[in-house]
Amino acid sequence: MTTMPYVNIFTKDIKKLSKFYIDVFDFEEDMSLRSPIFRGIRTSKSFFGFNAPEAYELLNLSDESDTKGIKFFLNFDVRSMKEVDRLVVLSVKRGAKIVKNPYRTYYNWYQAVLTDPEGNLFRINKRLPGKWKSSDWNK
C-alpha cells in the first residue's frame, strides 16, 4: 500500500500557522525539517508541512500562487465529544472561526467545521459507535 507521510499547506506565515496547529492539537515541530520556507510538525502517523509562498516558484507553480476559495480541508480525529467541544473553544481563542458548531452528522460522527487563521478549512471529529444510513445524507 502507498503511504502518505506528509500533507503540506501553502501559507503566508509558516511560523504563525504552524504554531496555531501545534498549540491547538498539541503537535510537535520536527526541527530537523525547519528551513526559511518550511516548517514540519509531527502528528500521530504523519507530518504536516507548512510551505512559504516562495515554495510556489520552487515547485514550478508560480502561475498557481493566487489561489482563492477552499480547495481542501483537514480532518482531526479526537477521543471524545467533549474533546471536540474543548478544541473548538481553544481553536477560536487561537484565531480560528467557526463555520459549523459541533453537531451529529448523518454518518454518525460528532464534528465541528472551522477555518484556521488563514482561512483554511478543518474539521474536528469524533466517530460515534453505531450504524448510519447513506439515505439520510440530506437530513
Segment roles from a protein language model:
Residues 8, 15, 85:
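Conserved catalytic core of two-component sensor histidine kinases
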Residues 1-5, 28-81, 85-115, 126-139:
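Vicinal oxygen chelate
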Residues 17-22, 91, 119:
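Conserved active-site tyrosine of GNAT-family acetyltransferases
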Residues 11-14, 105-107:
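Conserved beta-strand-loop-alpha-helix junction that forms the acyl-donor binding cleft
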Residues 9-12, 79:
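Residue-level signal for the nucleotide or nucleotide-sugar donor/cofactor binding architecture
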